[in-house]
Amino acid sequence: PALLFQWMEHAEPPGWTSLKPADISAQRTLHIEALNLRVVLDQLFTAHVAGHNPKTTTEHALGRPISWTLASSRLGHSERGTLLIENQYAPLHAAAALGPIAQNAVELIQSVDPARLRRCAAHLCLRWFVDTSKGGRRGWCSMATCGNRAKAARYRARQERDTAEA
């Protein structure tokens, strides 16, 4: 749960400040809901990339955190005066902070070419990303983390191989 809370503090989803769980039971519930959402998002993205509609169970599980949060939307204006839709969140409990994540995932698959949505190629990474590279060949969620680790591992393997051959 500590890493989840660090991420939540950084991401600041609507309602998080007022609903951050203080007791252990609520923290565990939020952690379990976040892990469940991660599995559901993986299923959603996998289906999207394969050109399939998500399973009904995936849709139901994705709809749960969305239903906990979204109270209403209204038309507003940006700082430049252009129209935009403002979502007014009314979170019911701490796990409701996961609702905007689920909503953004649905909006993402509506707007992204399935060929550009990728799972990170790093063995232990669970992240998905949108490949915006010119050639469409990006394999890592982040070159600073996963890509760098892969390059370092290849370098170490070459060094060990060269040492063994010498």
Language-model-detected regions and their locations in the chain:
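Short helix-coil boundary/hinge micro-motifs
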Residues: 1-119, 164-166
